[in-house]
Amino acid sequence: MNLITIERHILEQQKFFPEFTGELTDLLNDVAFAAKLVRREVVRAGLVDILGFTGDTNIQGEQVKKLDLFANDKIINAIGQHGRFAIMGSEENDGIIIPPKNETGSYALLFDPLDGSSNIDVNVSVGTIFSIYKLKGDDPGKASLNDCLQHGYEQVAAGYVIYGSSVVMVYTTGHGVHGFTYDPTIGEFLLSHENIVTPKSGKYYSINEGSYGQFNEGTKKYLDYIKEEDPATGRPYSTRYIGSLVADFHRNLLTGGIFVYPPTITHPNGKLRLMYEANPLAFICEQAGGRATNGKERILDLQPSELHQRTPLYIGSEADVMIAEEFEQGKR
């Protein structure tokens, strides 16, 4: 492993953004610091009283886990105190968040504090996903919901942190995708995956097939297709589904394959959150040479209309996603 810290690497990336005068370095360093705080508690979750539910329900209609709430508070407090973000949005909060010292901020932060948290009680990998936008206006005091509801292609940075057998942080600023592994002996994220490029096609698919009866005909035909025996096209594919989006996405990013969360009868507009999950992962995926759509349109081109907007998601290796789109659009 290279002894290049994430701070040094981000500083080197700053040359691509001279107009930010060092701000981008500070923004991503803030996120990395918050991730260290969350990581500290995730690895101790079974030893302290932060497993289980709080008894509350979030805006998504889901029961709030204690660790969800802890991670959410840590990120807001750790990042908000530095005055670089004028406004935030979290999957766990109903509305926008105005952090302390927001009057000096020039950016908006959107994040899922603990993706896959339903798995934490059984020690399955979970993660934090984040997305950063520049404010539309010049006055931080006037930051509003509109600053959060920007197209995905307007992101200036995005990334995620996986808390698993090791802790890995992956980020992009629009100039490639880079991964860092946390070394607990020195308390630093060190460069471990430079310039990640996802394979053009893979051999894995990730989907909750327990919902097969809820899928539309296009999705069902696609699943039948990738299970057929055809060595010439690398079929059949193998299923790899953890149930933690960030973990499934990370594996497919490195090995090739596709993650699918299609529309269902119960959730015709999809279930994943556009602003907290789909947009940041789509930005990363495209920067690594992959593709991300809702089955019909590019994820990064979607115009958000609400903070907690949902979307179907087809994301991963370019060739695999294109085939899935053809089935979804009735072209196969």
Curated annotation (Swiss-Prot):
<keyword id="KW-0479">Metal-binding</keyword>
<dbReference type="GO" id="GO:0006094">
    <property type="term" value="P:gluconeogenesis"/>
</dbReference>
<feature type="binding site">
    <location>
        <begin position="115"/>
        <end position="118"/>
    </location>
    <ligand>
        <name>substrate</name>
    </ligand>
</feature>
<keyword id="KW-0460">Magnesium</keyword>
<keyword id="KW-0119">Carbohydrate metabolism</keyword>
<dbReference type="GO" id="GO:0030388">
    <property type="term" value="P:fructose 1,6-bisphosphate metabolic process"/>
</dbReference>
<comment type="pathway">
    <text>Carbohydrate biosynthesis; Calvin cycle.</text>
</comment>
<feature type="binding site">
    <location>
        <position position="271"/>
    </location>
    <ligand>
        <name>substrate</name>
    </ligand>
</feature>
<dbReference type="GO" id="GO:0005829">
    <property type="term" value="C:cytosol"/>
</dbReference>
<dbReference type="Pfam" id="PF00316">
    <property type="entry name" value="FBPase"/>
</dbReference>
<keyword id="KW-0113">Calvin cycle</keyword>
<protein>
    <recommendedName>
        <fullName>Fructose-1,6-bisphosphatase class 1</fullName>
        <ecNumber>3.1.3.11</ecNumber>
    </recommendedName>
</protein>
<keyword id="KW-0378">Hydrolase</keyword>
<dbReference type="InterPro" id="IPR028343">
    <property type="entry name" value="FBPtase"/>
</dbReference>
<feature type="binding site">
    <location>
        <position position="115"/>
    </location>
    <ligand>
        <name>Mg(2+) 2</name>
    </ligand>
</feature>
<feature type="binding site">
    <location>
        <position position="277"/>
    </location>
    <ligand>
        <name>Mg(2+) 2</name>
    </ligand>
</feature>
<dbReference type="GO" id="GO:0006000">
    <property type="term" value="P:fructose metabolic process"/>
</dbReference>
<comment type="subunit">
    <text>Homotetramer.</text>
</comment>
<dbReference type="InterPro" id="IPR044015">
    <property type="entry name" value="FBPase_C_dom"/>
</dbReference>
<comment type="similarity">
    <text>Belongs to the FBPase class 1 family.</text>
</comment>
<feature type="binding site">
    <location>
        <position position="241"/>
    </location>
    <ligand>
        <name>substrate</name>
    </ligand>
</feature>
<dbReference type="Pfam" id="PF18913">
    <property type="entry name" value="FBPase_C"/>
</dbReference>
<feature type="binding site">
    <location>
        <position position="112"/>
    </location>
    <ligand>
        <name>Mg(2+) 2</name>
    </ligand>
</feature>
<dbReference type="GO" id="GO:0006002">
    <property type="term" value="P:fructose 6-phosphate metabolic process"/>
</dbReference>
<feature type="binding site">
    <location>
        <position position="208"/>
    </location>
    <ligand>
        <name>substrate</name>
    </ligand>
</feature>
<dbReference type="GO" id="GO:0042132">
    <property type="term" value="F:fructose 1,6-bisphosphate 1-phosphatase activity"/>
</dbReference>
<feature type="binding site">
    <location>
        <position position="114"/>
    </location>
    <ligand>
        <name>Mg(2+) 1</name>
    </ligand>
</feature>
<dbReference type="GO" id="GO:0019253">
    <property type="term" value="P:reductive pentose-phosphate cycle"/>
</dbReference>
<dbReference type="GO" id="GO:0005986">
    <property type="term" value="P:sucrose biosynthetic process"/>
</dbReference>
<dbReference type="GO" id="GO:0000287">
    <property type="term" value="F:magnesium ion binding"/>
</dbReference>
<dbReference type="InterPro" id="IPR000146">
    <property type="entry name" value="FBPase_class-1"/>
</dbReference>
<feature type="binding site">
    <location>
        <position position="91"/>
    </location>
    <ligand>
        <name>Mg(2+) 1</name>
    </ligand>
</feature>
<keyword id="KW-0963">Cytoplasm</keyword>
<feature type="binding site">
    <location>
        <position position="112"/>
    </location>
    <ligand>
        <name>Mg(2+) 1</name>
    </ligand>
</feature>
<dbReference type="InterPro" id="IPR033391">
    <property type="entry name" value="FBPase_N"/>
</dbReference>
